[in-house]
Amino acid sequence: MEMAVAVSRAIEGAYPLVVEASTGVGKTFSYLVPALLSGERVLLSTATKALQDQLFGRDLPALVKALQLPVSTALLKGRGSYLCLHRMEMARHDAGFPERSALRTLGKIEEWARVTVSGDLAELPGLDERSPVIPWVTSTRENCLGAPCPKFRACHVNHARREALAADVVVINHHLFFADMAVRESGVAELLPTVRIAIFDEAHQLNETGVQFLGKNLSTGQLLDFSRDMLATGLQLARGLADWQALSGATEHAARELRLVVGQAYPGSKLRWTDATPEGLHAREWAGALSSLLASLQAASDALGTVSEMAPDFVRLHERAAELAERALLFSRAAESGGVRWLEVGAQLRLVEAPLDIAKSIAARVFPPAQNAAKSWIFTSATLGDDEKLSWFTQPCGLTEARVLRVGSPFDYARQAAFYIPKNLPKPGDPAHPVAVAAAAADWARRLGGRTMVLTTTLRALRSIGDALQASFENSPDMQVLVQGAMPKRALIERFRQADQHEGRGCVLVASASFWEGIDVPGDALQLVIIDKLPFPPPNDPMVEARSRLLEAAGGSAFNDYFLPEAAVALKQGAGRLIRRETDQGVLVICDSRLAIMGYGKRLMRALPPMQRLVSEEELCERLDLLTRTCTKDRPPT
């Protein structure tokens, strides 16, 4: 109720509000009810498509019906979520289409295309979100033909945008919001001026999402896609009018040469790029590769310009060539001040330049000039900081002048949950630490009968702990180990959630990164969460380094003002996976002795819910045994 009243007042008073609403508060209904009752147009934005679908498909319809309001709603995603009818048709005839098995998937999509109304690929049963077919049947800003497209009238993206412009409540996601802010392409730009009330759920992801989109990037993947599209379109529609093989080959060769400059030395890393050349690379070779790339793109642009009147495909390809050349030129020059530049090394290269935060961009929209109408923008999440001002969120988002509210959880954590810090594990930096964590986790999971999630701070630890746990239970008919990456995230969570009920086997899930947040496994399926280390940001990450330097230059402390708040928020998010309902019970284990012995440990422990502290391995085992005896799996769901 406290949050609902605050949101209602912010809407009436036309001012921005930041709300940290802990698990169990009823955050979604607390902002939806006052927003719907306002009678105004409302924009809702979430961090994930999963919550976007939940809001549009479940929460909004239920409330609109309960309140008996004549409200129309619409769902708007990025163009990559919708089937492109033109590209689907082209894919069937493209010689470069993936292996034969992909043709079966394409056939299913073609069959579904005849009956779908929305064209939202999330509605197609059995389509793996990682399917290699998806890029062939969806459009990007770069390859969309726009109004000249032969399928323009039936376009699912345009239909979704028209519905959004006509609706009273529109549900979007943060990626779409910032993509539009960067290039004004998604349709949100037309929507925002008509909306006074905007609500950002899962707002803790706004800053990191925003810096991705408000910066610039160029990848070898983009270059190879362009090269492939130019070759296919040139041979199909303008054969003989230019040497499309040579033009395409030159761009492809330049992209691969750029990748070869880096070689195999830095797999999966981000290279600092503070001067003309990324760290560790040969300056002359790097400059030469960029120069060759720029020349190949210019030649492609010139050739495409001569045939642009023949078909809309060539107009868009000509624009893409110019955009890619502009980005190549940008990265051949010194970086702009106030941002950070780096090189991501993987199967492809990604050249990135980004702002350090989104403060200016958000503040300009939330606090408009006096002559413009004041806006009621609401920002909410279960985790927005570890101080009363929620500085971790408000400072980088330009919201230090916004009103702030923190609403505590109604859960009785002292009764429902306990946490433990093991004393005898190797230090976090010791190479033996991951194996020791896995051995301890195996013992605890065996005692509990599964129902365990191990959250790691790095992908390396994910692999080490995952491999060790799988080896521990390799011959066990009573326990299975699921490791992130083995299947799509949603399928992995569902398998973990249902393991005990349907298979009669215990289950341990080992995961990293995105599994620290947004995972909801209530009841007995999850009763033990193990965190391998304190989740400090990686100190050698270029963005982390740049933010640290900025703080130090301003007289602050990078550790106290950046690393600790980041760790506190991440720890709070990870711990939040444990207790999701008033009937849940469980144990949190943090396998990092620094939490108990370092002075900053007290600050990090204050970020955790007020759980009972277990002081010995014996107490932990007693608690796990108690959970086993009082398992509530036979209770009806609440």
Say what each PLM segment does.
Residues 1-19:
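Conserved pre-motif I regulatory segment
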Residues 8-9, 28-41, 58-62:
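Walker A/P-loop NTP-binding motif
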Residues 13-31:
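Walker A/P-loop
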Residues 37, 53, 58-61, 141-142, ...:
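Signature of the SF2 helicase/ATPase Hel1-core->accessory helical subdomain module
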Residues 40-168, 175, 266, 296-303, ...:
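A substrate-engagement module of RecA-like helicase motors
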Residues 135-170, 181-189, 299-425, 432-439, ...:
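A contiguous, basic/glycine-rich beta-loop/short-helix subdomain that forms a polymer-engagement track
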Residues 422-432, 486-596:
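Conserved RecA-like P-loop NTPase helicase motor core
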Residues 457-485:
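Conserved helicase motor "Helicase C" RecA-like lobe of SF1/SF2 P-loop NTPases
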